[in-house]
Amino acid sequence: MNYKYSAEEKQIIYNYILREYGQVDHIIFLSNEHIRVPIEYDILVIKKQNLQILMTFGLGAFKSHNHEENTQERAEIFLELPVDWDFNKHENMWPVHFLINIVKYSYSNHLTLKWLQTFINPSYFNKSNKIAGFLDLSWYGENSLECKINNDFFVSFYQILIIDDEELFYAKTNGIRALSKFFDDGKSRIVDLNRKSFVK
């Protein structure tokens, strides 16, 4: 089975993204070789005044085949990157690969992506101490949290917050919700591989 939005669903989601997140600067089109799961999606790049948003577009078509979940929720996910992030540099492509890996994990494990789920990368991001990311609610206003398609399902929008090895250990010890509070204190959510740990 191939998971993809209908033409109508795709237009609804795209218009929602334009309204709540901003104009799409360009699209990173993914080949079947990149995706390796039967979900048709690409990655949008949305340029804001002081940051760029890297967002999946099409992931929300995936309906979990885990019957125990029994949920109408589906998800698109995104990262915030510095405004001058250069995707032409090989070392700057890891956010794209991380998004792809999360999608693969979701499909392979029959999971609907949800708030506070944590994903550990196989290696550190670009030789930094950052190793994982967790899903948090969007901060782009109350209307940016979810897009209702019809009576069958709605699509939630989750931001991936990148964390280091010490923060990951803190989350394992104290819970991911406790860690998430450090990011709710007005701190920047833009990816910064050089930022100091919040739990030191």
Curated annotation (Swiss-Prot):
Origin: domain of life: Bacteria
Source organism of this protein record: Ureaplasma parvum serovar 3 (strain ATCC 700970)
A Pfam family per the record: SUFU
Name of the molecule in the record: Uncharacterized protein UU111
